[in-house]
Amino acid sequence: MTDPQTVSAAVAKLYDTYPFPPEPLLDEPPPGYNWRWNWLAAYSFCTGQKPQQEAIRILDAGCGTGVSTEYLVHLNPQAQVTAIDISAGTLAVATERCQRSSADRVQFHHLSLYDADQLPGEFDLINSVGVLHHLPDPQRGIRALATKLAPGGIMHIFVYAELGRWEIKLMQEAIALLQGEQQGDYRDGVQVGRQIFAALPEANRLVKREQERWSLENQRDECFADMYVHPQEIDYTIETLFELIAASGLEFIGFSNPRSWQLEPLLGKNPALLERAQALSDRQRYRLVELLNPEAVTHYEFFLGRSPLPKADWSEDATLLAAVPDRNPCMDGWESRCLFNF
């Protein structure tokens, strides 16, 4: 399957069959938070300072059933949110989800990422989680999104990593082989996949990895289908990831989980090796981490930015003393009178 239109149609069919993510619809705001979806927290992470405005425009690119969209609306009370997706079925769920939780500052569009230029204006925050790696041409997709990012704006991206999903790729191919001409029948694919897991020995590597890492979420057919019978998936390594980033023309700000990219937990027992690693570039150190700890790197989650994007320097005492502190909205999941809970 190489024709882009055929691929896009197959992806839309999957999500029309199994709307994803399958989180339940609530008649109230969603619980907790994801700080990456909170403008104040995300901007502070990227720049080291609070943004000057909160009345921003947000694009949820590939919104699925609206789980991320709903959070983006509720976590950013002054923002206007636009959400797009290629699947009409998931958009219907997303619309109902936001209506039921009173997330009313959102507009939905049945649109491919490739066609983001059809949207009016620019956006201060673009969120695209789990979407680019399902496009026939992810570089074209990220370029389309980059054209909609306003100067000084930030983009939050999540894509799959190759090394940590090795067993998944094997199972995907096994299911496709056994489906034969029925490949593309996603309900049959889920049934075949579950039968394979049930038939394999308990000590089988694919079974063990599924049980250790994925089985809880994969109890739901929607999650199982998204993982094992998806018609289009491109997984990345550090090298190919930065090729994707370069195609965007945007600045790489950093991974949103920076502690996961530290070498100390891996090589801390040997200071000499850590010293050798200091001579490596950032990208080489990232590559070293995923080579030494491949099971932990199942995806990459990071921020990109468009200049001019300020970077606060708090090394000067005078600057620090002149700063006006403000509580991070994602310090706790609820309002609290205390700064730290012990």
Question: Where are the language model's segments positioned?
Answer:
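Conserved alpha-helix/loop element of class I SAM-dependent methyltransferases that forms part
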Residues: 17, 27-56, 71
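Conserved SAM-binding loop of SAM-dependent methyltransferases across substrates and taxa
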Residues: 65-77
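Conserved SAM/SAH-binding beta-strand->alpha-helix loop
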Residues: 87
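Conserved SAM-binding strand-loop segment of SAM-dependent methyltransferases
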Residues: 102-114
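A short acidic, Gly/Pro-enriched loop at the edge of an enzyme's catalytic core
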Residues: 117-125
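A short glycine-rich, Lys/Arg-flanked "PGG" loop and its adjoining helix->strand segment in the class I
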Residues: 140-151
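Conserved class I S-adenosyl-L-methionine
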Residues: 154-206
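Rossmann-like AdoMet/SAM-dependent catalytic core
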Residues: 212-342
